A protein has these predicted regions:
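Helix-adjacent hinge/juxtasegments
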Residues: 57-97
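Terminal transmembrane helical module of multi-pass membrane proteins
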Residues: 125-165
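N-terminal signal-anchor transmembrane alpha helix
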Residues: 1-24
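Helix-coil boundary and interhelical linker segments in multi-pass alpha-helical membrane proteins
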Residues: 1-8, 61-77, 121-131
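Membrane-interface loop-to-helix entry segments
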Residues: 43-57, 100-112
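Cytosolic, membrane-interface loops and tails of multi-pass inner-membrane proteins
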Residues: 24-44, 152-165
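Hydrophobic alpha-helical segments of small multi-pass membrane proteins
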Residues: 79-92, 106-119, 135-142
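Membrane-helix boundary connector in multi-pass membrane proteins
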Residues: 96-101, 117-133
């Protein structure tokens, strides 16, 4: 039997968290980010919202499947790892778009990448291949986004009067 309130919370936390980050940085995307030198393989801006929404929903559903197997008490370690990577995910947006700190955004994303692997590894014994099916696209996208972040860092030197490593 589906625990509807738990499912709704598990889905809404990542999706709404991502939406808040997106709305909070919309001005920077149209201003600062638009002025950056970008690689030919940079996706169009309109693609980020739908991709992240799907990924957030998938990870939320994966967390629900784990939660369903005994709640926080029984699944404390996998859910703690998941929550930690989600916090790092949410932290990346202000590091990159608000503070313009490519260096800190890269460190954040590297730690997040490792924690996504740990999330998959700890979810898999609980929910089987659902963990791979739901979270592997997220890992692939974060790998791509990490490469993009590093490319932007290397190819967009800080402007005079702006602090950036």
């Amino acid at each position: 039997m589906v625990d509807v309130p738990a499912l709704v919370v598990c889905l809404l936390v990542p999706v709404v968290g991502g939406m808040i980050g997106g709305f909070a940085t919309a001005k920077e995307i149209k201003g600062w980010y638009a002025g950056l030198k970008k690689p030919w393989w940079n996706p169009p801006n309109w693609l980020f919202g739908p991709v992240w929404t799907c990924l957030y929903a998938a990870m939320g559903y994966a967390s629900y499947l784990v939660y369903e197997q005994g709640g926080f008490k029984a699944q404390a370690a996998p859910l703690a790892i998941y929550i930690t990577q989600l916090v790092l995910n949410f932290a990346w947006t202000p590091l990159f778009f608000t503070l313009h700190r490519f260096d800190l955004a890269t460190v954040d994303m590297t730690a997040m990448w490792g924690l996504i692997i740990a999330t998959i590894a700890t979810f898999r014994p609980v929910i089987g291949n659902w963990a791979l099916g739901l979270l592997l696209p997220y890992l692939v996208w974060v790998t791509y986004a990490s490469a993009l972040t590093i490319w932007l860092w290397r190819n967009n030197p800080a402007k005079k009067g702006k602090k950036r490593a």
